[in-house]
Structures are given as C-alpha cells and as structure tokens.
UniProtKB/Swiss-Prot annotation:
The modification Phosphoserine is found at S519, S732, S848. Residues 674-721, 1000-1026, 1118-1132 have a biased composition (Low complexity). GO terms for cellular component: cytoplasm; cytosol; nucleus. This is Nonsense-mediated mRNA decay factor SMG7. It comes from the Eukaryota. Part of a complex that contains SMG5, SMG7, PPP2CA, a short isoform of UPF3A (isoform UPF3AS, but not isoform UPF3AL) and phosphorylated UPF1. Interacts with DHX34; the interaction is RNA-independent. Keywords: Acetylation, Cytoplasm, Nonsense-mediated mRNA decay, Nucleus, Phosphoprotein, Repeat, TPR repeat. Its main location: cytoplasm. TPR repeats lie at residues 152-185, 187-219. Residues 525-537, 584-597, 649-673, 990-999, 1063-1082 have a biased composition (Polar residues). It is found in: Cytoplasm; Nucleus.
Amino acid sequence: MSLQSAQYLRQAEVLKAEMTDSKLGPAEVWTSRQALQDLYQKMLVTDLEYALDKKVEQDLWNHAFKNQITTLQGQAKNRANPNRSEVQANLSLFLEAASGFYTQLLQELCTVFNVDLPCRVKSSQLGIISNKQTHSSTIVKPQSSSCSYICQHCLVHLGDIARYRNQTSQAESYYRHAAQLVPSNGQPYNQLAILASSKGDHLTTIFYYCRSIAVKFPFPAASTNLQKALSKALESRDELKTKWGVSDFIKAFIKFHGHVYLSKSLEKLSPLREKLEEQFKRLLFQKAFNSQQLVHVTVINLFQLHHLRDFSNETEQHSYSQDEQLCWTQLLALFMSFLGILCKCPLQNDSQESNNAYPLPAVKVSMDWLRLRPRVFQEAVVDERQYIWPWLISLLNSFHPREDDLSNTNATPLPEEFELQGFLALRPSFRNLDFSKGHQGITGDKEGQQRRIRQQRLISIGKWIADNQPRLIQCENEVGKLLFITEIPELILEDPSEAKENLILQETSVVESLATDGSPGLKSVLSTGRNPSNSCDSGEKPVVTFKENIKPREVNQGRSFPPKEVKSQTELRKTPVSEARKTPVTQTPSQTSNSQFIPIHHPGAFPPLPSRPGFPPPTYVIPPPVAFSMGSGYTFPAGVSVPGTFLQSTAHSPAGNQVQAGKQSHIPYSQQRPSGPGPMNQGPQQSQPPSQPPLTSLPAQPTAQSTSQLQVQALAQQQQSPTKVIPALGKSPPHHSGFQQYQQADASKQLWNPPQVQSPLGKIMPVKQSYYLQTQDPIKLFEPSLQPPVIQQQPLEKKMKPFPMEPYNHNPSEVKVPEFYWDSSYSMADNRAVMAQQPNMDRRSKRSPGVFRPEQDPVPRMPFEDPKSSPLLPPDLLKSLAALEEEEELIFSNPPDLYPALLGPLASLPGRSLFKSLLEKPSELMSHSSSFLSLTGFSVNQERYPNSSMFNEVYGKNLTTSSKAELNPSVASQETSLYSLFEGTPWSPSLPASSDHSTPASQSPHSSNPSSLPSSPPTHNHNSAPFSNFGPIGTPDNRDRRPADRWKTDKPAMGGFGVDYLSATSSSESSWHQASTPSGTWTGHGPSMEDSSAVLMESLKSIWSSSMMHPGPSALEQLLMQQKQKQQRGQGAMNPPH
C-alpha cells in the first residue's frame, strides 16, 4: 500500500508544480487543484499513517485551499481592483466549496475508521442505511491517535473557513470541538485566541495563547503571537484613573504579564501589582467580573508561574537570576492576593449562585495548583498573607462539610476542569477525572450537582492543607461533621459596601438610592412605565432595571440641581424615556436637537426655567399648577372649569420653543416640568390655577416627566389642590413631567417620546396630528388633531359600545378641558382598564397643567379661540365635553343632551364629521387648532392628549400603519401623557411586539441608555418599517421630531398619539411619514387645510355664538352639515400624502 501512496505523492508533486505555472489559465489551475484534492484525500483514507508522516494534511490545506484563499482575499481587499465584486463572489464560492470538501472528508474518515465524534452527524441520521466501503481491503488501519489527529485537523480548518466567512459562532464551535478531541494539541487554542482577538477580547486572547503554549504539543506560532500581543500592550499609554472599570483592569493585568513574560521594565511590577490588588478587590465586590473572567485571570497567573518554574524545577535545586526571582515573587504575591480576595468575596456578597460574581471555580483552580506545589507554602510572600487562611476556613465551613465529602469519588469533571484539560500547570490534578463523556457527564440538576461536587473537592483540599500545614489550618471531626479552625486572626476588610456601588455599569448608585427613597407616587409612575400594572411596587424595579440610564445621567450631572429634583430625575433616568420627552426638559428652543440625546431621567435634562416666576430655582422641582393664563384673557362660561393645561395662553413662546423641547405645547405642563422650554413655561402655564388636577396626575404620568419632575408636580399638586388625590398621572398628558415618567417606564411609550413633540404639540398638536395622519380615515386623521367631541364621536362610532364612559356625573368644575384628553378612548380596547383606573385622576391632575394647546403655536389665536374667553363655547357643551373627557371610557353611558346631539349626528353621518373634516385639514387645524379646541373645550386636552384620545385607539386598531405618523409632534410629547394615562396598560393592545419592552434598547437612537426598557421611542423602530424612525407603530424617529417643529413643513412628522402604539405594520405600511419626511409631510398641504379650517371655525363661530347658551341638536346638525359639505369639497386635499 505504501507503493500506491508513494505514487499518489509523486502525482501530487506534479500537480503542485502545474498550479504554480503562470502560463496556465484559471481553468487549468482549477482542474489541477481539483485533482490534487482528490489525490490527497485518497492518501489520507487509504494509508493515514504514511500520509501523516509525509505531512499530506498540511499540503492539502496549504496548496489546495489556503494559498488560493489568501490570493482572493488580497484581490478583494484591493479597492483599486475594478473586479472586486467578481473576486468577492469567487472567494465566497471557493470558501463554500472548501467547507464542503472538509465536511465530506471528515465524514468519510469517521466512517472508514469507525470514529465516533460528539460533533459528527451519523450517516443513519442522514438517511443512509448502509455505508459500503469500497476497496476496504486496501485500507491500512491507523492508530487511534492518528485518527483523532486527522479529525481534529479537519475540524480546525472547518473553523478557519467559517472564520473567513465571518461566521464567528460556527468557527468557535468547530475550534472547541477540535480542542476537546485532542486537548494536548495547542493548535485549536491558538485559533480560538485569533478569534477572540478579532472580537477585541484581550483577556480571552491572552488566555488561549497561554493554553496553546502550556500543552504537551504546543503550537509553534502561539509563542510568537503571545509575545506580539504582550508587546503591543506594553506600548499602549497608561491612563491615570482612580477607579478602574473591568476593561481598565484587564489592560493593566495584561501589562503586568507583559513585563514578566518579556522581562521588561521590571521596576514597574511592584506598584502595578499593588494597584491590581486594590482594584481587583473593589471590582470583585462590585460583581463586575463573571466566573469565566475570574478563571481566565487565574489561569494566566498559573501559566506565568509554571513558565518561570515548572514541576521539574520544583524537585531540583536551581539558581535563578535576580530578575527571575523578582518576577516569581511578584507573580506569586499577586496570585495569593487574588486567592484571598476570591475566598472573601462569596462571604461578603452571599451570592454564590450569581453568575456575575461567582468566584468558586477560580478558587478551585487556585487550590488545585497549591496542592500540586506544596513548597509554595514556604515562600515568604505566602507567609506575609496569612490573612488568606481564615477567609478560606470561613468559606469551607459555609459548605457545612461532612466526613462523607472526603470519601467522594465522583470522577465527573467540572466545567472549569473540562476547559483546562491538557493544561500542564494543572494536568496532574485531572488525571483521575473521566473526560470521555464530555459535557454529558452530569445528568439532571447540573448546576446543583456541579456546585456540590465543587464544594466537596474544595473541602478535600482544605483537609489536605490541614494535614500538611497544621500551623495554617486545623480540622476537627465532630460526629461526622467537619469544622475547620485556625489560630490566625481574621482580617476585617474595609467596608466592602463600597464595592456594592455596582461600579462600572452602576457608577451612579445614588440613582438607585434616590429611586428607593423617592415618593411612592414616583415609584408608581416608574412602575407604570415598566409594567402595565399601576402598582407602586413595580416602580422600584425600574430603578434597578434602568441602570443603563445612569450613565447618560452622569453626563447631565454636571448641572447643579436640588437634591430633591435630582432624585426624581434619577428615577426617571432609570425608566428610560424617549429622548424627545427628555428634550422638552431642556429650556433652549433648539431643544429638539438636544432633547433627542438627553433622556429625561438625566439631571441635566431639566434645567431651571427662568420663565416660571413661581418655580423654584431648582430645575427638577415642578412648580404647583399655575392659574389659567389665557393670552386673550378669555374666560370660560360660568360653571365650567378648564384645567390650566387647556388654558395655556396662546402667548406661549412660538413654535420654536415647543420645538426645542419637543415637549407638549401646553405651557402648564412645561411649567410643571422644569425641563419644559423656558418660553413655554413663561406662558400662562404659570397662571394656571392650583386647582388643576395635573399635579395629582403627575405621578401617574411617568411617561413624559422625569421622576424628579413628577415629585415636584406632586408637591405642586398638593399646594395647588391639596384636596385632590394624586391619581395615576399616566392619563393626563398635559403634565409633561408625568408623561415623561410614564414614557420612561413604558418602553413602547418611550417610542412616542422620540418624536418629542411636546412643545410643538402644545402649539398646534391637534392640527399637526392630522397633518401627519396617513391616508387613513379622515376621522382618524382628524382625531389626532381634534380629540375633542369630534374625536370622541369617531372612536365612539367604532368603539363607543365597547367603551362605556363614566357616568356623566362629573361636576363642571371637576371636568376640565384637559379631561377631554381621550385617554380612555385612546386606549379604548386594550387600555380601557388602565384608563378606567387612571383617567379620572390622571386627566384631572394632568390636563390642566400639561395640556398641549394649539394656542402655544406660533400662530396667534383668535379671541374666540381662547378656551376661557371664547363665547363660542357654550357652557353646556363645555360641561359635557369635560364630562366625556373625565370619563375614562369613551362611551357616553349617561351623556347629557349635548352628547346625543354630538354623537347622534356626528357618529351616524356617513360623511365626515365636523371634527373629521378638521382633522383632514391638518394645516387649518394647526393654525386654528387652539381656537377650535378652545371652542370645543377640547383644545388644550386634545392637544395634550392626542395620543390617548379615542381617535388614537381607532388608529391603534385600524390605522396601525399610520398611527404613529398620524400622531402629531405634539402627540409625541403627549406620548408620555398617554403612557401615564395608561399606567396600568402600556398600550399593549395596539402594540404587537413593537413595544419598547420588546424592542432592544440599543435600537433607540435617542436613548442615551440603549439598554433601558423604556428607552426613547426609537426603541419602537425595530417594529416599524426600516424606512422610518418611527416606533413600532410608525412613529417618526425622535431625532427627526425633536430637531424640527412637527407643525412646520421642515419639521419631521411624528405620530405621538395612539399611532405610536399601533402594530408595527401600521408604521411600515400606513405611515405616510415613511414615504416623506416625517416632519413636513403635511406642511405642504397646510395652506389649504388652514383655509378650510378657518372657514369651519367661522361657521362654528356663527352657529355657536348665536346659540351659545342653548347648545342643541339643531346647531350641531347645522355644523355637521357644513362640515360634511366642506369635507366633500376638499376631501382630497385633506388626506395626508402617503
């Protein structure tokens, strides 16, 4: 057989020469390569021993595959190559063929030599009944070790091919299977190191280079690779830091080993070691490491110790140079210090089961090495660290050792032992273990059994130390129970609670304490955002869960705010809020740009608002509700009380302010929130009467406002309306702070935040909403902009039955225009329960302060537009509207005469209702939204509550695609309020899987904390169509919303009301924003819409002014008829472009 193999080898040499001949074309070279592959395969299968002696497996890889791969890779990387795309295609095809070749070769080798690999799929599983081997008599049976080697060779190169194809997970799997097959061969470990290096994992890279060297058959290139990696680490600059993160510690740790391995700058070892010991203790108590990292650190130390003095040197007398002795001393000191801290950590944290800080595997590995090197106990550095042994004894006694543990003969390897099989420094310790079963050695409760086996082996090592080093440890046997004792006094560490700061990830541990100390109202708000339930208990969770937000908050920490406010903000930070919501916090009119990137939960996100006279200098404190301030001085009819949110004066700063904050346009709301834009705050918000319920609702509004703002609002509520209970704030969008909190809590709600239309919303929120509505039903379009009775009617038509409104028994005074925030209707189907719980309190408390008012829009409001001064708004109508708004359900269970008048004609008419037409004319609504809303008594509420209005619900159900787009920028700001409205239910009904919770935080472009659940609305983007930055429902990206005024054509359109909560399909398909810029989609149609709106407003004026005190079906019917006619005329123009 050797003759035939020799003949194959000669033919292979000829083929290799032909392949290097430049005269041959690609086709001839390809043919020669295929022939060479076939020859080598035959040699490996027929005479494996001969082939391995001739290194055929290496020639096969190098000449048949690697050289060609390297050539194609070089050509593909050359950007000047005009045929790059063709080369890349050829490379992909060649890698695919190479993978197939080695897979087939491995399968054939296993079949021919009857090798059973754990990673191999047997032929029977592939449907192959029999494997008839041809020429079986000609096959020379190889040794089992040769079979294992060639199979490992195939697995390694399969991993290489997968790595070239950027399939890192598959490559790692191949490498690990290869290492398990022959642990004494260093090649798989070298490849794993290369793979880890490509991922930027420096600690794992060094670990596997050490593993590749410290084996029976080290891989030659591993030593060179390790030297290069350590040299590169030494060349990096040192950064002076008082506190290190894990990455800082790893860099310093690798530098330390670079000094030792390369014997360079040894004078730096001692100070660097001391710093490493100090930071290791701090990080370990903070649970910054995981179990695998601790094992890697320990093994790297053991590798260096073994490299300096192996076992052969232990038994013989050797003279060491001064440098070698210094390196050994410093390394051993570092190793023993780490061991002591590892023994102390589980006692301090009492969390052995925690994967984040589980040091026992590293302790086990360290103790195994000490048992193999008994002379180490005589070293001076070990004597200097006798405090280790009392800690070790406490650890062993915590296992409740028994005499039976010493006789345990379980040979099953632990995970750390399985990982380190073949490691020369520990090889003798693993001789009695059975690695043949791989990871399947333990069945049933693996973790529990492994924990007990590890404890038993540690107890056994402790007993060995007690027998051989009685001066350090003694062991007493009391009726089968073991007790370890020592005469060495135990060292009490400095308060390790410092470690519990949760360093790195939790640098702002204060945030957690603040959240814990925060008022129950704030907690409830946070919990609401987090969980559908309104329970305050859930509020605590957000504090712990949203640690990611802490970092962004650090950025804002620079701003000085009252501690009280900071607390609230801290909690808010924990509950990720859409950047848009946070944006409103900033005072600058350009907030839109900043707000996207400033989460509300950040302290700096809420600078003090100088425009608020009554507001305390601390920006975090939210002033009590301000008396109604109507720019026009308009007053509502007697008997009608309008929340301050609705009464915000049109005098509010122009849209610019609103835009900057992206906050709701309602001044009262911004005033409540320190983060509201200064100009907006200056508006009548301040003058809102303390009776406004928004304050009470603020706690429930966690969506929009920061926790601090919520707290401030609660205080203000108590001041303004001490008699009012602080209900769930979630429903009252007017309260920006409340909304922010809710948004933070609810990830899906946060999606709304990104639009951060709060400021624009306050201005022309309703109209803009319609601008952004998709080609959805005119009613739906209208609903976002006009959430007043019109909106109610539309949703009522669709959902009125399912949503019985609260009995129309609210007093006019209690009924606030903001209450018309159709929170209940907005969440009509899924949010009913939540809304039922929250709507009354939230609406009342939030609406007055935070309602978005079209008045705030730069467009001046007509005197009649002012909700207070508008004579067009009949008291009865106001009362009825307020009652409807107050009622959580959209259904009018006990509507006054006005309700039937409104519902009957509006809901039943086949054509568009007045409100529908208004909605269809977003531009008009935008310009006259304040007037219309004030006329209807919904102006403020609609603006503030567009998200929660029943039209939103309708959008949520029917207009999922355009729901987000439909929402106005103001709606986006109101999103927070919507969330607060639905504290119990985070719009789960309309949100499929696109809620913030389902969305990865990282997708949230505006969220400073990508991990935070309630992070900015961008989180929803994953659900929405990729073309838009909208939330799952299609809400435009917060960034777009914030930078541009939604009401302006140049601003991004946003669906902040119910649309954001719609299913992802709505955002992807229906969202007209997708087709065009989200902000300016409707702006192009603004003039026509404004004209129609003006005409409609004039007609309303004439009708309502004539019968102001006698609202009845006749006036409404006339208005509806006019509206219907107008709709028919300009219906085309009213529909938003898609």
